[in-house]
């Protein structure tokens, strides 16, 4: 863990954006989890360290998934949307991340 903390510049690049969707809000209310879009090469340990550093909360666990991009047609050519890596961050009881307050 101390090796990861040394490289704060890398931790700033791990979290790309919070995922704001219906499923993400249900998970946040029910399980005290927050969903982030993360860098494709990010590890669970890096995500945990980045969330603890940026939001000053304690993280219980991290689950990650890679959502494959859809094949889409652009005129007569076939293309593909980018793959997205998401991290479901489970916070310890009593911890909360409020994005509205963070933005102000």
Swiss-Prot record:
Q: Short name of one Pfam family for this protein?
A: Ribosomal_L23
* Keyword terms: Ribonucleoprotein, Ribosomal protein, RNA-binding, rRNA-binding
- GO molecular-function terms, A-Z: rRNA binding; structural constituent of ribosome
Q: Does the keyword RNA-binding apply?
A: yes
A single GO BP: translation
Q: Which GO cellular component does the record give, naming just one?
A: ribonucleoprotein complex
In terms of domain of life, where is this protein from? Bacteria
InterPro entries the record matches: Nucleotide-bd_a/b_plait_sf (IPR012677), Ribosomal_uL23-like (IPR013025), Ribosomal_uL23/eL15/eS24_sf (IPR012678)
Q: Does the record carry Phosphoprotein as a key word?
A: no
In which family does this protein belong, per the annotation? Belongs to the universal ribosomal protein uL23 family.
Q: Which NCBIfam families match?
A: PRK05738.1-3 (NF004359), PRK05738.2-4 (NF004363)
Subunit relationships = Part of the 50S ribosomal subunit. Contacts protein L29, and trigger factor when it is bound to the ribosome.
Q: What does this protein do?
A: One of the early assembly proteins it binds 23S rRNA. One of the proteins that surrounds the polypeptide exit tunnel on the outside of the ribosome. Forms the main docking site for trigger factor binding to the ribosome.
Q: How is this protein named in the record? A: Large ribosomal subunit protein uL23
What is the originating organism of this protein? Answer: Paraburkholderia xenovorans (strain LB400)
Record gene name: rplW
């Amino acid at each position: 863990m101390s090796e990861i903390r040394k490289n704060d510049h890398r931790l700033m690049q791990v979290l790309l954006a919070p995922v704001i969707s219906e499923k993400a809000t249900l998970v946040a209310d029910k399980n005290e989890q927050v969903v982030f879009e993360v860098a494709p090469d990010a590890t669970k340990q890096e995500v945990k360290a980045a969330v603890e550093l940026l939001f000053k909360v304690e993280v219980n666990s991290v689950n990650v998934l890679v959502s494959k991009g859809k094949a889409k047609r652009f005129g007569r050519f076939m293309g593909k949307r980018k793959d997205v890596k998401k991290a479901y961050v489970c916070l310890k009881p009593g911890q909360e991340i409020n994005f509205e307050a963070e933005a102000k």
